[in-house]
């Protein structure tokens, strides 16, 4: 029987993701990088999606050094990508792998803290596009590959601000509220597919560049490293979470803030 916090205390077997093909956006840094490396260390074959090729190449080299699995790089600038870019990525994935067992959305933009009354419209559009619209577009084109898997998992990275929006969080808060809605809507649509489950994860306070940008006065030494909050991602990507669908979960017990 699954407990409410089973995902937070998950201790995966070394080969829990062996043979699975998993795509991660934002794989060049932060939580996305940590999830990609952890999934590879547990046997998954990775598709590293991100904007900065040099960072993706670094992660690719680290995965190769593990000698546990393989990885491929799929450069994609979510801010500027058009429909053809998504289609080409999906076609290349289908040709090489034939299926997709996991899709982790970790790429994101913070935007600028400002009241709605004065929020910069171009910044608003950029944040909503990268954090929400791009996640929708990529999921849509990859659904056929996910349906080809016997047990596929989609993970949308949410935030505490999605559940309790607060002043001055602007487009970021709205985008994360949208991610929660997108996750639950898609989960309900796929409820009876039997093959694809969809959930959202809130990493909580983590030592990343985005966190430092949002809370410049915060002591980063008091925050967990991205590597320390990946077990819930591995839990949702693997067989231990079979049947878990439409949930919004916290990586940390506090379920805290942004």
Regions found by a protein language model. Name each.
Residues 66-82:
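Rossmann-fold cofactor-recognition segment
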Residues 2-7, 192, 196, 200-201, ...:
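C-terminal helical subdomain
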Residues 20, 68-69, 99-101, 146-159, ...:
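Active-site loop of short-chain dehydrogenase/reductase
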Residues 44-58:
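Conserved glycine-rich Rossmann-like NAD(P)H-binding loop of the short-chain dehydrogenase/reductase
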Residues 147, 151-192, 205:
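Catalytic loop of short-chain dehydrogenase/reductase
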Residues 21, 26-30:
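Conserved glycine-rich cofactor-binding loop
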Residues 89, 114-116, 120-125:
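Substrate-binding pocket helix/loop in short-chain dehydrogenase/reductase
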